[in-house]
């Protein structure tokens, strides 16, 4: 490419310096002495920006892929159904246990009710008035009432 250069005297002179457009063209040159340093700097910066943009794009792709991988954890789609199953099983177990305990309580209650009824019947039988026995007990209590209370309590069976 042809360039015009200003000399110190202020005249324009025709200058023929090679001006490569890419780094590959710059690499094909035999010598870098004829190439302006600003052109070299511009080409290097341009290529560096391209490489940085490619690296950044690859890094963004990698980060988005990692984000998708974290979201697509194999167990995550089964977590909610497993929690629901766990809660359902726990509920069934609690209801079953409550029904079993209620049945045991009812069975124990019926056995105790029959035992209480039997004891009440026995108590009624024992408390029924018996003519011969009551007269003897009444006589004994009248005789025993003349003694002090502590003698009746402590020595009632020894006489």
From Swiss-Prot:
Please provide, in alphabetical order, the Gene Ontology terms of the cellular component aspect for this entry.
INA complex; mitochondrial inner membrane assembly complex
Q: Which subcellular locations apply to this protein?
A: Mitochondrion inner membrane
- The primary location reported for this protein is mitochondrion
One Gene Ontology term from the biological process aspect of the record: mitochondrial proton-transporting ATP synthase complex assembly
Q: Give the UniProt keywords, A-Z.
A: Chaperone, Coiled coil, Membrane, Mitochondrion, Mitochondrion inner membrane, Transit peptide, Transmembrane, Transmembrane helix
Coiled-coil annotation reads 102-124
Protein task: Component of the INA complex (INAC) that promotes the biogenesis of mitochondrial F(1)F(0)-ATP synthase. INAC facilitates the assembly of the peripheral stalk and promotes the assembly of the catalytic F(1)-domain with the membrane-embedded F(0)-domain.
The family note in this entry says:
Belongs to the INA17 family.
This chain belongs to which protein, by name?
Inner membrane assembly complex subunit 17
Task: Write down the species.
Answer: Eremothecium gossypii (strain ATCC 10895 / CBS 109.51 / FGSC 9923 / NRRL Y-1056)
Protein's gene = INA17
């Amino acid at each position: 490419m042809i360039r015009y250069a200003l000399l110190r005297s202020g005249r324009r002179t025709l200058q023929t310096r090679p001006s490569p457009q890419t780094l590959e063209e710059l690499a094909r040159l035999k010598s870098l002495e004829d190439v302006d340093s600003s052109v070299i700097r511009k080409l290097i910066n341009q290529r560096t920006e391209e490489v940085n943009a490619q690296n950044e794009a690859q890094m963004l792709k990698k980060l988005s892929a990692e984000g998708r991988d974290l979201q697509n954890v194999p167990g995550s789609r089964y977590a909610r159904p497993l929690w629901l199953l766990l809660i359902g099983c726990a509920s069934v177990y609690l209801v079953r246990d409550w029904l079993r305990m209620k049945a045991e309580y009812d069975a124990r209650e019926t056995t105790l009710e029959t035992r209480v009824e039997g004891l009440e019947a026995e108590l009624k039988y024992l408390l029924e008035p018996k003519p011969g026995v009551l007269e003897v007990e009444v006589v004994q209590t009248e005789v025993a009432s003349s003694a002090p209370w502590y003698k009746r309590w402590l020595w009632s069976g020894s006489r």
